[in-house]
Amino acid sequence: NKQFKIQINASTIDEAYLKELIEKGADLENMEVGHNYYPRKDTGISYTLLKERNSIFEKYGFSIMAFVSSLNERRGPIYEGLPTLESTREIRPLLSAQYLLNAGVDIVIIGDAFASDKEINDMTTIKKDIWTIPLKAENITKEEMDVLSGVHTNRMDPGEFTIRSQEARLKKTSTIKKRNTGERLKYFLTIDNEGYLRYERELQIVMKNLPSDDRINIIGDLSESSLLINQIKPGDKFEFLID
């Protein structure tokens, strides 16, 4: 029946089984591929398995679907979310959707029926080839906000312990005054203040605990987005969604 497509479970089928279906006359044009969702905690599949399965179906030209959880109102009777990946069960859809897309998923569905308006609106900000990282706007100065704005590119030669914006220091802003300095923990976002002279406006995401430096302002904690930040490679683009 060409009006309805058959969907096969991407989480449980390997290439040998897919080849068997093809040998028996399966019409790939009439098939779709979707990963399972897992209501019980600790049963979602791994990122490694997801990418492994996706690489199979990509070879055959399939679009791939997978699920993320809502943190708003979860489906009963278990109420533990409906994700494909276990690692995204307790993560907001904005982040888990990008994690899936980076692994080769084409279509992301919120498994729980009652996602909040904010969760849905946040997902509409996702852009192809740009990581969207949420940031709580707590006591950020106008000058710092000017540095944060727009799209940033991780330098092709980032530091061993930092993600570095190649655009930030070129921004035309007023002086960045010293404030909120202290120990720089992993996943902290920082901007260099006027004390760092020509490095003023340098924007970094810290990838290892580093000591306090009075020349470096701490802007916020991005640890909520650690799954995404760990995927940022040299040359990757990213921007901040101010919560």
Residue ranges and their predicted role:
Residues N1:
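N-terminal active-site wall of soluble small-molecule enzyme domains
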Residues F4-I6, I64:
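Hydrophobic beta-strand scaffold residues
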Residues E138-D243:
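C-terminal functional modules
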